[in-house]
A protein has these predicted regions:
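Short, exposed beta-strand/loop patches in secreted or surface proteins that constitute
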Residues: 19, 41-45, 58-59, 103-109
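A generic structural motif
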Residues: 31-33, 53, 69-71, 119-121, ...
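An acidic-aromatic
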Residues: 38-89, 154-155
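Flexible, surface-exposed loop/linker segments and immediately adjacent secondary-structure boundaries
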Residues: 81-112
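N-terminal leader/targeting segments and the immediate start of mature chains
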Residues: 2-38, 44-49
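Gly/Pro-enriched, hydrophobic low-complexity segments
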Residues: 100-175
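Short, solvent-exposed secondary-structure boundary motifs
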Residues: 7, 30-37, 46-54, 91-100, ...
Length: 175
């Protein structure tokens, strides 16, 4: 009789990160719950770069500079975000810095999914905790719940996620 080892929080996060790096890019459709109610969007991630779109905003990040377009004002803001600011605009970025930036702890789940709670090691991140929920195989994230220090909560539910081919560099830059 062989028993499979119970996955640790770190192995669950590592498995998701490995799945996200197995192809040159990752494309996902998601729903954000919190704030102004449910908002659907798409994201394409390639390494540290990403492009995200919802009806309210569009965000491009080329690995250094982030452009955020707000549909309500028609204005674009340009920043060079910190790691914490990136995690707020792209919750998938949490998976790339979990080893050094968060303390990870495995949580139980009655639906057989794999859940990990991340608590920031630094005090000034703006986050109280983040809960990442993986599929039953632990390969892909299904949801990322962010709890902010000020009591706000945002839930990012991943409706569909898949590996993708290399993307043109212009996809990650505002033009």
């Amino acid at each position: 009789i062989t028993f499979a080892a119970t996955p640790t929080a770190e192995s669950i996060l590592g498995s998701m990160r490995k799945s996200m790096l197995a192809k040159p890019a990752v494309e996902a459709k998601f729903t954000i719950n919190g704030g102004q109610g449910p908002v659907q969007g798409t994201i394409c991630i390639e390494g540290a770069k990403f492009a995200m779109a919802t009806p309210q905003l569009k965000v491009w990040y080329d690995g250094k500079t982030q452009w955020t377009y707000l549909a309500s004002t028609g204005e674009v803001s340009i920043t060079e975000p910190t790691a914490d600011e990136l995690a707020a605009s792209n919750p998938f970025a949490i998976l790339s810095g979990y080893e050094t930036r968060y303390k990870a702890r495995k949580l139980t789940d009655s639906n057989g999914r794999r859940r990990v709670e991340l608590q920031p090691r630094a005090k000034d991140t703006g986050f109280e905790k983040i809960i990442v929920i993986a599929d039953t195989a632990g390969k892909w994230p299904q949801a990322i719940n962010i709890y902010f220090d000020d009591g706000r909560q945002i839930s990012l539910v991943i409706d569909h996620i898949t590996g993708a081919a290399n993307q043109p560099a212009k996809l990650f830059r505002y033009d």
